[in-house]
Amino acid sequence: MLKTISGTLALSLIIAASVHQAQAATTYNAVVSKSSSDGKTFKTIADAIASAPAGSTPFVILIKNGVYNERLTITRNNLHLKGESRNGAVIAAATAAGTLKSDGSKWGTAGSSTITISAKDFSAQSLTIRNDFDFPANQAKSDSDSSKIKDTQAVALYVTKSGDRAYFKDVSLVGYQDTLYVSGGRSFFSDCRISGTVDFIFGDGTALFNNCDLVSRYRADVKSGNVSGYLTAPSTNINQKYGLVITNSRVIRESDSVPAKSYGLGRPWHPTTTFSDGRYADPNAIGQTVFLNTSMDNHIYGWDKMSGKDKNGNTIWFNPEDSRFFEYKSYGAGATVSKDRRQLTDAQAAEYTQSKVLGDWTPTLP
């Protein structure tokens, strides 16, 4: 018996030592901490990014727990942010599209972003990215209040057309209107949590979401029986095969205060675009959102329409049936099969595997 116990103890010590060695073997090119004063650790993420050498070799930054009030633009390829924990390592800013710059101009939707990705092969893991613009407080103001911001889009994460192969693992994105803007390349979101109200996942990029929570937030400014928001607003070009693809995920409510049938799965965004014959809603933005094997709470009612401007400046409507909006094996209180919620066949659903959506890119972490 003693021999067996000794052997078990020895094995346990070997395993513990192996785990310790594996952790010690994890190397970071830079470490960020709000509390360290050893002279080797950066106090801001921006300073850590600036320390990365030119080139495109992998550069990995460990972000210790803390709230970092920073706005970041990533332009270096192969940069990787690793948080100490998803809820503990927080990058936050509070800028809305209507927030004024020092010169009096507005930041605009894209300019409101807390983090902007304009590089290839970026990754973020185990951290939170927030846009802390106080949407509820702003909406509670009187329309006659000069401090009330009219353009309330407030992006937490923006992947630009210069971005490609952006990988987000165990990341929380927090905002209200326009939380996540994917405008270019390919992005992969795995085990993530994305919360918002109006069009909180939008854009014309290709983005695959797997095992994610899409969280609809409560709005005190919306009267009972009215629509509170929309999960997606894709503007995918007609020649692009994939847009926003959500698989094996959960469409949930922030709390029971979110009413039943108050959120749409998506609406078609045709962004106002300048053409040779004028400026009007892009007719080629035949947006795609597809939900596969995803559970839906009862706050979901289906798809919706969205307005735009024609060549003469008149309001026109774009209907969901004219877009690429589909579901496959949705389930839960918010799932239903009807003519207004088109379903994929098994053969069609087979076209939405990770390898097909992301092509020649297999997401990996450093």
Curated annotation (Swiss-Prot):
Pfam families registered for this protein in UniProt: Pectinesterase
Coiled coil: none
Keyword Secreted: yes
Active site location: 178 (proton donor), 199 (nucleophile)
Site (Transition state stabilizer): 177
Record key words, sorted: Aspartyl esterase, Cell wall biogenesis/degradation, Disulfide bond, Hydrolase, Secreted, Signal
Protein name: Pectinesterase A
Name of the encoding gene: pemA
